[in-house]
Design a protein with these regions (language model features):
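Short, compact, well-ordered microdomains
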Residues: 72-118
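N-terminal domain-onset segments
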Residues: 1-69
C-alpha cells in the first residue's frame, strides 16, 4: 500500500525509507540533486559524487540519515528512488509537503491506482 503523508512535520529520510520498505531490504537507491541544501544550511551540494548514481543501500544509508521538515513550505529532502525486491519507492511532494510512496516493481493485477502529490 502507498504511504500517506506523514503527520509529524519532522521526518528522517532513512527512517522513512525503511518504514515504506517494511520487511523488505532496500537493494539500491538513486539520490537526486537539490537547488538548496537547507537541511545543511548551504547552497553547495556536499555529496556531488553520489547524485544521480545507482548506490547500494550500504553506500547510501548514512547519506540519507538526516532529519528534515516534511511539512508545507519548501522541499528539504533529497528526491529519491529506491528499489526493494517487489517495490519501487519514490519521493512525493505537494506544496512543499514531502513524503514517500511506493508502487509495485513489476506489473501487478488487482491493485488500485491513486493520485500522488495532491490534487
Amino acid at each position: 500500500m502507498p504511504t500517506e503523508a506523514m503527520e509529524n512535520t519532522v521526518a528522517n529520510l532513512k527512517e522513512s525509507l525503511l518504514a515504506v520498505a517494511g520487511e523488505e531490504p532496500i537493494l539500491e537507491i538513486v539520490i537526486g540533486d537539490k537547488e538548496k541544501w537547507r537541511f545543511l544550511n548551504t547552497d553547495e551540494n556536499p555529496w556531488p559524487e553520489y547524485i544521480s548514481k545507482l548506490l547500494s543501500w550500504e553506500e547510501a544509508k548514512e547519506i540519507v540519515d538526516y532529519d528534515f521538515d516534511s511539512g508545507f513550505g519548501g522541499t528539504e529532502s533529497h528526491p529519491i528512488m529506491a528499489w526493494t525486491q517487489t517495490r519501487v519507492i519514490f519521493s512525493v511532494c505537494y506544496d512543499g509537503s514531502e513524503w514517500l510512496a511506493s508502487a509495485p516493481r513489476n506489473p501487478t493485477d488487482g491493485i488500485t491506482p491513486q493520485h500522488y502529490g495532491g490534487g
